Amino acid sequence: MGDAESTSKTSLLLPVERVENVTWRDLRDGLFTAELKRLICFAAPMAAVVIAQFMLQIISMVMVGHLGNLSLASASLASSFCNVTGFSFIVGLSCALDTLSGQAYGAKLYRKVGVQTYTAMFCLALVCLPLTLIWLNMETLLVFLGQDPSIAHEAGRYAACLIPGLFAYAVLQPLTRYFQNQSMITPLLITSCFVFCLHVPLCWLLVYKSGLGNLGGALALSFSNCLYTIILGSLMCFSSACSETRAPLSMEIFDGIGEFFRYALPSAAMICLEWWSYELIILLSGLLPNPQLETSVLSVCLQTTATVYSIHLAIAAAASTRISNELGAGNSRAANIVVYAAMSLAVVEILILSTSLLVGRNVFGHVFSSDKETIDYVAKMAPLVSISLILDGLQGVLSGIARGCGWQHIGAYINLGAFYLWGIPIAASLAFWIHLKGVGLWIGIQAGAVLQTLLLTLVTGCTNWESQADKARNRMALAYGT
């Protein structure tokens, strides 16, 4: 083990310097401005990275959709099923690295960052095995759940072609966190843009020219995930910028499995409980009168908020990385300033986006549909969607702060209560008993988001940052010896 790492381990035993809480003078001085600039420089390119990754699936869906209603319906159903049962779970589990790797990097335990990344790859690959069995039996499951047999059959074939992409995704997510937690966003930006630019013509060729049809969209997505993983993996292994955090493959990766899952499982619960609640709202919309209209409009609203959420995620990633780094280094005041800066940036961003949506609400629906009834309904929903953007922006950054601090278990309990004990019951009551239909469903789920945001704000506002820095340093010392 290198001298640098040994020195870092020893430093973890030193007492943390006690500092007073952040004051208005700190916010007026250059500390706040400097941190705000850091967050912007991190979040701006990270937003492009997240959007490029998000658009891979959208491009496949759009091209498959032009093949006909059956292809679109089956691909949409398969994508939704795979997101709920697979991709969301992988993303959630990988968020454990926001705490572990971020704080290790801040504590200058650079080699541990690489070891933790390998541990996460191994664990996520294992998780993919049972998920693969579920996907291979998707047709049977969908028919059992009452789906049309022809749609279920095509959806099952589509999901089977996504399996290679699932395993690639299980490696890609830890790699993304590896670079993100070191604030190395440029490799992510260049790689994501390159893969996206290649994905578009590749998807077109496989869908329209190869005879594969809708399966071509799934195969193109799997190939792009694999290519993305290969490029980032090569950079990790061979780039000089990664020399400090690069670690050789060894039995050491198995030592951290318990610690990884200790944070990964509540991380997955935190992410999936929120993600699944919105999918449940779409399912409930199918039980309403005129289900085609209600489902279409709610899908447009959900697609809009999901796209904009890419920007929220970028700010959340910046906040999570900066806070975990500063806590790992024992800098409690700096971590506190990050919170103020990140929330300030989020407020500016959500005001711009929500105002833009309100101003353009009458043309908003034309982006997604040419049906007048759908366009008018979307315009009616626009004010509610604007409120959703505000809530998503605030809770997204607060969730990033929670991951940076290692509060995933708290976030999981909050999301469980806010959405499943509060939001969804209200949504069902408003939609089916008060007869507000799709509007009621959306109001209900946003009631859950309001409670989620308030509780996360309360937890963050009551935080003793000196104690959090102590916990981070003690966690590093306990996990990696002294």
Swiss-Prot record:
GO terms for biological process: xenobiotic detoxification by transmembrane export across the plasma membrane. Keywords: Membrane, Transmembrane, Transmembrane helix, Transport. The keyword Transmembrane helix applies. One of its GO terms (molecular function) is antiporter activity. InterPro entries: MATE_euk, MATE_fam. It is found in: Membrane. Pfam families: MatE. The keyword Chloroplast does not apply. GO terms for cellular component: membrane. The chain crosses the membrane at residues 39-59, 77-97, 124-144, 159-179, 188-208, 218-238, 268-288, 297-317, 337-357, 381-401, 416-436, 439-459. It is a multi-pass membrane protein. Signal peptide: none annotated. Belongs to the multi antimicrobial extrusion (MATE) (TC 2.A.66.1) family. This is Protein DETOXIFICATION 13. It comes from Arabidopsis thaliana (Mouse-ear cress). The gene is DTX13.
